Amino acid sequence: MKTKIGIIFSAAILLTSIFSSPSLIHRGTKHETNLISSNEVKAAINQESSEQSTIQKVETNQQKKWEALQLNPLPSSKNLTYSFSNSTKVFTKPFPEQYQTVNGILSFRGGPFRNNGSMGTTVISKQKLVKSWSFQTSSSAGWGGGSGWTGQPSVIEWKPQEQKIMNLYSQFKTKSNFKEVVYGSLDGRVYFLDLATGKKTRNPINIQNPIKGSVALDPRGYPLLYVGQGIPQTGKIGMRIFSLIDGSQLAFIPGIDSYSFRGWGAFDGSALFNRDDDAMLVGGENGLVYFIKLNTKYDPKAKKIKISPVISKYRYKLKNNSYQGIENSVAVFKNIAYFADNGGSIQALDIIKKRPIWANNAYDDTDASIVIENSNGTPFLYTGSEIDKQGTKGYARIQKLNGVTGKVIWEKKIPGYSIKGNHPVNGGLLGTPIVGTGPLKGQVIFNISRYKTMNGGLLISYDTVTGKEKWHLDLPNYAWSSTVAVYTKDNKAYLIQGDSVGNMYLISGSGKIINKINLGANIEASPVVVGQQVIVGTRGGKYISVNIQ
């Protein structure tokens, strides 16, 4: 088991041997670059005519109407052997272009493209971060409280109908502009807080096992909550679905499954719901991808909701990849799901036809979620690996891929380090990247941990088309927390970045530190931004709201 605890280690002897290694001396080596070692594949959009033809066909057919991609399996899919646990047809339609019908941040990084964790528009005048409220969680043995990796909250603006029938405390049942923060904690509880004040809005749900990943809410605004369990401490390990009318558990799906090829049953990934199919999609650390028909029956007048899940499980084996397990949150473009595994292989899976389209070779553990960019109807993917299987030193591989063909558009390799042993703490890419929009359009921003030194970090921006570096920012402390882009009313862009010693940075869109605040403990979790507020959990047992002024 790979424990994700962001601990700062001092390892002078190890660093001495690492820094003297000729494989990490970049000038004059085969990895030469002024900052980043790079095996760059120049933009294949303009160079590979066969790929361009494929892209153009997809654009022509899909650009005008949001409909399922009709893709045939490519030769790389033959490197897979796969099966489904049954022939049940779970998905019949592509994920809708508009993921949700209610305001909120409902899954990790917002939705199927996994591209950002923000909502609303921010007004920034003083360019300063100020703490506004904090909430102290309880603690579990060995894991404490607060939030770990990925640990992003969901935020929802409930419609009045649901607000009235749920088990909210009375003062919140009729509160106007009510937004609720839903946060899974390492103490084994799901907490519910008022976004404005940080006060509890209802009693927590206790699963009695640490929650490391990010919870998810139903995009229809139905009072349904998905919770993945990170660590087994009591009872069985698996994923749970709860009613938010009364907090009751509606379904438990065990992670220890005889159908899987791996005996680790955690769920760190955040689920997605296809509201047109009443269906849910999530990957497990047991190596299975779960297609779940919910069969939801919701009667708000009677204050009742129930589900009758029917599950079809996808399993696979890939040549030259013996590592099973999906820790990232599955990304989806229409009917094509994308995920990476603990070996670093990346797959495209048609969830309607229930078959893989392509599968790229393994490299190294890839836990950061894949981010999708929709370019005129063609999906492009941005992804990166950790430094894990490579040992105590290696390269985080950063890639842009064509989501239709799996071909590499450009690639970078960034040097870094990892701590191995019984308590490994990996370097490389663990935070999920950002594909910019508006004033950040044309940029993709990655956050690399353990760069240059064991404690160092790197924030780096690339041109999405060419892969050329636009800017970089060296950070004194590494970060597993995902970067969030903040867009203002005056058409400016800022970045929010937490790090492993509790610093939260406000950074300009060109990579300059503007302001910072220390929140007292490691920020391993990924924040969300709602208007002027940044909400994030720390390993110090707190949820904290920071105001952007």
Question: What is each model feature region?
Answer:
Residues F95-T121:
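Predominantly extracellular/luminal regions of secreted and cell-surface proteins
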Residues I18-S38, A43:
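Sec-dependent signal peptide cleavage junction
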Residues A12-I13, E40-V41, G467:
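Intrinsically disordered, low-complexity serine/threonine-rich segments
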Residues T3-I5, H31-T33, V41, S49, ...:
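Intrinsic disorder/low-complexity segments enriched in polar/small residues
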Residues A12-I13, P22, T33, S248, ...:
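Intrinsic-disorder/low-complexity peptide segments enriched for small residues
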Residues K2-R27:
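Sec-dependent N-terminal signal peptides of Gram-positive bacterial secreted proteins and lipoproteins
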Residues A44-F91, N115-F267, L272-Q549:
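Extracytoplasmic/lumenal domain signature
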